[in-house]
Each structure stands twice: as C-alpha cells, then as structure tokens.
Curated annotation (Swiss-Prot):
Residues 529-569 form a coiled coil. Its main location: nucleus. This is Bromodomain-containing factor 1. Residues 137-147, 718-732 have a biased composition (Acidic residues). One of its GO terms (biological process) is regulation of DNA-templated transcription. It comes from Candida albicans (strain SC5314 / ATCC MYA-2876). GO terms for molecular function: lysine-acetylated histone binding. The gene is BDF1. Transcription factor involved in the expression of a broad class of genes including snRNAs. Required for sporulation and DNA-damage repair. Prevents the spreading of SIR silencing at telomeres and protects histone H4, but not H3, from deacetylation. CDD domains: Bromo_BDF1_2_II.
Length: 732
C-alpha cells in the first residue's frame, strides 16, 4: 500500500523547471505513478475533507486525472464549499471507477517507485499551489473551465514557478501598488489663435435693453471700480504684442475688460443686469485662468470683484414702483459709493411713518437759514491767529507736494477699507485722519489755532504706526513724512504778545454776532484804514483852503505895492544924476517881497509808495538812520525787526522819510539850475495844487471859479513885472 502523508499547511519546496518537465515527459509510467500518488492522497484526505469538484469531462482518462489533481490542489477552501453539494454524488462514483481500473496496473510499481512518486506528488502539489494564483484572479462563476488552461500555459512557457511569490496573495497587490492620477494634458500650440471679434455685435443688439435708471447705476458702478488702483490692469483689452503673450487667445477664447463692459452699457447691449455681472466675472475668471490663482494680478482681480459685488447690492429694480419718478431712481444711482438714502421701494412707507410721528410731536420754531452771501464766520481773526494759520497752510502744502509723493501718497486721502481689503481698519483706528481732510478743514476755517492743526497731523502718523507694524513699507513712509513735518514745524513763527484790547474786541464781535446787528456805514467808519483816509481828506481840504487864502492875500499885497511904485516913478521924471543912480539902483533891485513860509506839503499815495519801494534797497547805514526817524515818532518794542506800515504812520513821519530819501536829489537838481523868478515858483506850486485837487471830485467842481480868478491875478502879476523890467531898461 502507498504511504499516507499527513495534511500540513507548511510550504513545500518547489522543484526546478527542468525536473518538472522531464518527469512530465517520462511516459505513461510516470503519469500512472502520478495518478496513483494523487489517488492515494485523495483517499487519505477523504476522511478529513469531502470531494471538491466534479471531474473534467475530457476524452482521455489521463487528462481527466491531471484535471482532478489540479482541482484538488488549486481549489481554495471557500470555493470547495460552494460546489460541494452539486458535485458530491458524481465525483464519488468517478473516483471509485478510476481507482478500480488503475490499481491492478500500478500495484507492482508502488514498492519500486515509492520515492519518485513522493517526489512527483510533492512537485505536483507545489506546482498546483503556484497555479492557484492565476486561477484566483479568474471569476468565481466558472472555476473549472480555467483549470485546464493554466497547466498547458505553464508547460508551454517553461517559466520558473519560483518567480511567483507564495507568501502574499495576489488579491492584495492592487492595494500595495499606488497608481499616480493622470496629469492634465497641456496643449501645445504652434500657431497663435486669431483675435476674437470686438464686442458688442452691432447687428445683434437686443430689442429690450435694460432701462435707463439701471443702465446709469451700472455705468456709475463700473466707473467707481475703474477708479480703484488695483483695476489698472483691467481697464483696457489685453495687448498681446505689448505684453509678449502671442498665445493668449488660444487659452482665452472670449476676452473681457472694464472698457468693453462700459461700451456695451452705453450701446445698450445688455438685456439684464445679470449679464453685466456675468461679463465682470468672466473677466476675473480669464485672469485667474491665464495667470494662476496665486499670482498677484489674480488677487487684484479678486479685490475689485469684491468691490463690484458690494456696489451691485444697491442696484434698483428693473420696474420701478408706481408713483416713483425716474429722476429719483437715477439720483439714487448716480453715486453708489456715497449714497446713504434708503431704497425707493421703502420711500412711501417711510413717509407715512414720518407723517404720523410728526403729528404726535410738538412743533418747533423754525429759524431762517443764514445768508449765503456772508461767510460762515464773520468774526475777523486777530493777527496772531491769522499768521499761525497761514503757516499751517504752507505746512500742509509742503506735506502734500509732489516732491514727497514717493512716501506721502498713502496719507493724501481717507483709507478705503474695501479697495484695500482691510475690513478691520475701523476697529483698530478709532479716529481716522488724512492730509486731504486737514486741508479742507483749513480752507473752511475749522481750526482755532495752530495747536489744533498740529494735533490732527500727529493723529495721521499715530494711526499709521498703530495699524502698520514696524518694518512695513507704510510704517517707514510715515516716519519719513513725519521727519519732513518736524523740520517744517520747527520754523514756526513765535507768536507776539497780544494786548488786552484784542480780547475786548473779540468779545465785542462775539456779542455782535449773537445780536445779529446789521452792517451799516457807521460800522465801516470804524475800520482803521477808512478812518485814516477820511482824516487825511479832511486835513487836505483845510490845508487847501488856507493855502488859497494866503496866496491870494500875498499876491494882492504885491500888486498894491507895484501900483504905488508906478505912481512914484511918474512924479520923478527929471531927477539929478545921483538921484537917478539911486532910482536906477532901486529899479534894478526892486524891494524883495516878504518871505513866504513854504506851505506844508500834502502826503500822497505816490509818496508812500516811493518810500516803501525805496526801503528794501537802502544800505545798512541809511536803514539805521531811517529806523531812528521812525522811533522818534513811533515807539518800537522789538529792535531786531521793524514792521513798516505806511498807513499807520503819521504824515509828518512820512514827510521826514520822504525828505530823507529824496531830499538830496532835489537839492542836486536845483543846484545846477538858475533860480526861477517868484512868479514861476508860484506857478509850480499852483500846478502842484491843481494836481492834488484833481484827486477829489467835489473840491474840483466846487472851487473851479476861484481857480480861474486866481489865474487872472497871476497873469496880472506877470504883466506888471514885464512892464517894470521894460521901464528899467529905458532909464538905463
């Protein structure tokens, strides 16, 4: 009898391929031995396990025995249980028949070939274990049909069964081997695509475009987005030549930009507001598709998209409610960034609510508005405050000048939290401030003094350092601009001590504002400049009257003296020689008229102008002498700096200054010339007086007759002098 082999799960060493092939080709004897060994194994295992599968109905018993051998060694335990009930009866009969037919033939060779049979059986078992892997990969529905195919394939190929690993099942291989996902195929373009046609298509404009109020709102929204700094790359279509992107249209078949959207709105190419939103989103999508999500320009596109969506929330409806004018809707839509009114749909209900509340409240007194012709602040500021505010105006212009633009541009306008994408700015900075706001407050006279101005400027830099930490660009710009401000503010003029009268005048002006006193001519006379001019006019008129009286009196006296001399000459026609000489001397040297006191000259505007223009050109020596002249009449507190105001100086002081500056020239001009006769001097004085009288219309019109009489007297005087000179020549 054949030896029984205990059933174990330990792996058996697989023989080499050459030994396996030689034994398979050894003949019927070797096959019989294999069949016997397989039958003995199956009989030994029948006590433990039931038959697994029915025999393969092959035409030859040798083939059928090999199939049974393969089935017993390859079939897994799970598959054996499935087909146990179906094949139990048929398999048992077939196996018994095969054993009864083969036992007489192989009984004699059992003892001889016991060792080879074991070896073959071991080889067959190992071979079957190796064939178990490809069979497990096959579907479970037909396990019997694939068993005979596995053996011939293995025999034909002659592969070494050791190459297939036995320690791990083949079903786990897909879990171990991880396959990378397929990468997207990047298209390779050889030729650039043509430029798409320009939008909109003028031949396919919609019949029912969006209404006018919606179009105006959307247009203003696009303009507001275009004013954003981050919208610069999206203002115009992409220039593929300038930007060196020839394959742009291969990736972007339908380009879009803000100017195209604006042109389509103006040409009424949109039927609904949603189409405008789609075009804007297409522009942002094209940017991210061509440049990538992480690019800087893609982030800029995201920021302007957020601003656009925030503004489009307030878009008016397509059909306005009844009783709403188009002008009201457009007024709401004209300024979407600064509009704070409620929507038009809520206007009717809000008006009703206000009317009901107004009826329940007590009526208040209505005060008339202030006159638009007068400024908001009629109180004149004193010189100290005015000088400080002038310096503040110069300082703000210096801070906002273009030469500091590299580091002052973040502070020129209020911070736009939407455009800069900093929604938490107002939470950190409680009191925002900028240079533009400071300049407008200066223009509106909202600062009382320079300290308030400095406080706001310091607030700008404080907010900058609070929101931007050290080391950031904006923080460094703030430090540079603050250094410019400190340098400029160090040159602020020192305020002069103000007298107590200024406080009294301020109180008077404040009381006048409270009482709303009307302005009259009497109030104008209180202005110092007008008072000075009025006093000068009165004084000049008095001086003119006195001068006229004096000159007329003197001329009449001279005329009377000449008449007496003529009468005396007529009585003395035959005198002696000595007497004639005496008379000749008397005629040649007529008695000098009494010396006239020169009239006090009148201070004119031209004289003041000449003095003021001459002062800057003086040397230090003359300037010191001029200051002494001023100090004689006016008390000056500060010796280092003298403010020369010609209107505040008295006339005598102005005359002294004029004589000091221009007196030498007059003497030099008169030294080289002969003395004019008294009549010519009088004529010059009269001409000067006439020029002064021309400045006053009233004096000229009222005293025209007296001037004519005065000229007649002068002419008579000239004729008498000529007669006297002719008589003296005849006597000689």
């Amino acid at each position: 009898m054949s030896e029984t082999f205990p059933e174990t799960n330990t792996p058996v060493q697989t023989p080499s391929t050459e030994s396996f092939v030689n034994k398979m080709n050894a003949g019927d004897k070797t096959i019989g031995n294999n069949i016997f060994s397989q039958d003995s194994d199956s009989n030994q295992q029948s006590s433990h396990q039931e038959p697994l599968s029915p025999p393969n109905p092959s035409p030859t018993p040798e083939k059928r025995q090999l199939d049974d051998e393969v089935d017993n060694s390859i079939e897994p335990e799970s598959k054996k249980q499935k087909v146990e009930e179906e094949t139990e009866a048929s398999q048992t009969g077939v196996i018994q028949t095969e054993v009864s037919e083969t036992v007489p033939e192989i009984e004699s060779s059992v003892n001889k070939d016991s060792e080879p049979v074991n070896g073959v059986s071991e080889e067959s078992e190992n071979t079957n274990n190796e064939q178990e892997k490809p069979q497990e990969e096959a579907p479970e529905e037909n396990p019997q049909e694939e068993v005979p195919e596995a053996k011939p394939q293995e025999e034909a190929s002659g592969e070494n069964p050791q190459e297939i690993p036995n320690d791990k099942p083949q079903d786990d291989e897909p879990d171990i081997q991880e396959v990378d996902p397929p990468k997207p195929v990047v298209p390779v373009f050889t030729e650039p695509a043509p430029k798409p046609p320009q939008e909109p298509d003028m031949n396919n404009l919609p019949e029912n475009p969006i209404p006018q109020h919606q179009a105006k709102f959307v247009l203003n929204t696009i303009k507001a987005v275009k004013r954003n700094r981050e919208a610069v790359p999206f203002l115009h279509p992409v220039d593929t030549v300038k930007l060196n992107v020839p394959f742009y249209y291969n990736y972007i078949p339908r380009p879009m930009d803000l100017s195209t959207i604006e042109r389509k709105i103006n040409l009424k190419a949109y039927e609904d507001v949603s189409q405008v939103v789609d075009d804007f989103n297409l522009m942002v999508k094209n940017c991210k598709k061509f440049n990538g999500e992480a690019a800087g320009i893609s982030k800029m596109a995201t920021n302007i998209q957020a601003q656009f969506e925030k503004l489009m929330v307030k878009v008016p409806p397509k059909e306005l409610p009844a009783g709403t004018n188009v002008a009201e809707a457009t007024s709401v839509a004209t300024s979407p960034t600064t509009n704070k009114r409620k929507s038009v749909a809520e206007s009717s209900s809000s008006h009703q609510h206000r009317d009901s509340v107004a009826a329940a409240r007590p009526k208040r007194t209505i005060h008339p508005p202030k006159s638009k012709e007068l400024p908001y602040e009629t109180k004149p500021k004193n010189k100290k405050v005015a000088a400080e505010l002038r310096f503040c105006n110069q300082t703000i212009k210096e801070l906002m000048s273009k030469k500091h633009y590299n580091y002052n541009f973040p502070f020129l306008a209020p911070v736009d939290t939407v455009a800069l994408n900093i929604p938490n700015y107002n939470e950190i900075v409680k009191q925002p401030m900028d240079l533009g706001t400071i300049q407008s407050k200066l223009a509106n006279n909202e600062y009382e003094n320079a300290d308030d101005f400095e406080k706001d400027v310091r607030l700008v830099f404080k907010n900058c350092y609070l929101f931007n930490p050290e080391g950031t660009d904006v923080n460094m710009m703030g430090h540079r601009l603050e250094a410019v401000f400190d340098k400029k503010w160090a040159n602020k003029p020192v305020p002069e001590p103000t007298p107590q009268n200024s406080d009294v005048s301020d109180r008077e002006y404040s009381s006048e504002e409270e009482d709303n006193v009307e302005i009259s001519e009497a109030m104008l006379s209180e202005i110092p400049a007008i008072q000075v001019m009025e006093n000068q006019i009165i004084r000049m008129r008095k001086e003119l009257d006195e001068l006229k009286k004096e000159h007329l009196k003197k001329l009449r006296e001279q005329q009377a003296a000449r008449k007496k001399k003529k009468q005396q000459k007529g009585k003395r026609r035959a005198p002696k020689a000595k007497h004639t000489k005496d008379t000749q001397h008397q005629v040649q040297a007529p008695p000098e008229p009494p010396k006239l006191t020169p009239p006090q000259p009148v201070v004119t505007y031209e004289m003041k102008k000449q003095v003021s223009e001459m002062v800057p050109n003086l040397s230090d020596k003359k300037l010191n002498a001029l200051i002494k002249i001023i100090q004689d009449d006016v008390q000056i507190s500060n010796d280092d700096e003298v403010e020369l105001d010609m209107d505040q100086l008295e006339d005598r002081t102005v005359l002294k200054l004029y004589d000091f500056l221009f007196g030498d020239k007059a003497l030099k001009n008169s030294a080289g010339k002969k003395k004019k006769p008294v009549a010519n001097n009088n004529l010059d004085e009269l001409a000067h007086l006439r020029s002064q009288l021309a400045l006053f219309d009233e004096g000229v019109n009222g005293q025209q007759g007296s001037d004519n009489g005065f000229m007649k007297v002068v002419n008579q005087e000239e004729s008498s002098e000529d007669e006297a000179s002719s008589e003296s020549s005849e006597e000689e």
